[in-house]
Design a protein with these regions (language model features):
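Catalytic domains of riboflavin
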Residues: 6, 28, 32-72
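Thiamine diphosphate
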Residues: 2, 52-201
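Conserved thiamine diphosphate
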Residues: 1-44, 195, 200
Length: 201
């Protein structure tokens, strides 16, 4: 979803555009396991399916015994202090942020929300019960993506909580490597951990 030739090669609005298309399902796998499973599922899937792949090799998040279904997110970690909802390659960064937070005795939940549409509202609502805060992380514009979807559910359900959307702002992005750009826009594991602490302290 990314190239180093400037803003024209930064695919950060695709989810927002495609979410508006009727019956089009959107999946963003976070590791090799999710990638393999969504490809296998896509063969016999009855509706149009958009799969967004990252460019670089991804770290292993899931074990091979994990179940996978389009439209059903996966709980990677569980803790009561804060919930990270992430998708695609940002799941790995959220995972690393949680490892930093665990050193300070914070216990966090991590949801790999690989399917943006249809969205797993049941898992989202179940995961945020009794938590102190929610952070969404996505390699996408803050408009029209994962964070905005979560915000709309919170508003419709009249849930008041500490909530933070982390993505790309409404501006032309800086140029650099994928890692450098994500770090610049507050998606380094260290910065995510700091944001989490500030959100719930």
């Amino acid at each position: 979803s990314y190239g180093q030739l400037g803003s024209t090669h930064h695919s950060i609005h695709d989810v927002a555009v495609l979410r508006a298309i009727n019956n089009l399902n959107i999946v963003i796998p976070c590791d090799n396991f999710e990638t393999q499973e969504v490809i296998k599922s896509a063969v016999n899937y009855s509706e149009p399916l958009f799969i967004r792949f990252g460019k670089k090799p991804m770290l292993k998040i899931h074990n091979e015994n994990q179940s996978f279904k389009i439209g059903k997110g996966i709980k990677v970690k569980e803790g009561k202090d804060l919930v990270f909802i992430a998708t695609g390659e940002t799941v790995q960064r959220a995972y690393q942020a949680i490892e930093i937070l665990e050193k300070d005795n914070f216990k966090c939940t991590l949801i790999s929300m690989h399917t943006i549409k249809p969205f797993d509202e049941d898992l989202f609502l179940q995961s945020i019960k009794n938590t102190k805060g929610i952070i969404t992380v996505e390699e996408h514009s803050e408009s029209g993506g994962l964070g905005e979807k979560c915000a709309s559910i919170l508003a419709q359900k009249k849930i008041i909580t500490n909530f933070k959307v982390i993505g790309f702002p409404d501006e032309y992005m800086v140029n650099g490597s994928q890692s450098d750009v994500l770090d610049y826009y507050n998606m380094s594991p260290k910065t995510l951990a700091e944001i989490a602490k500030n959100l719930i302290s």
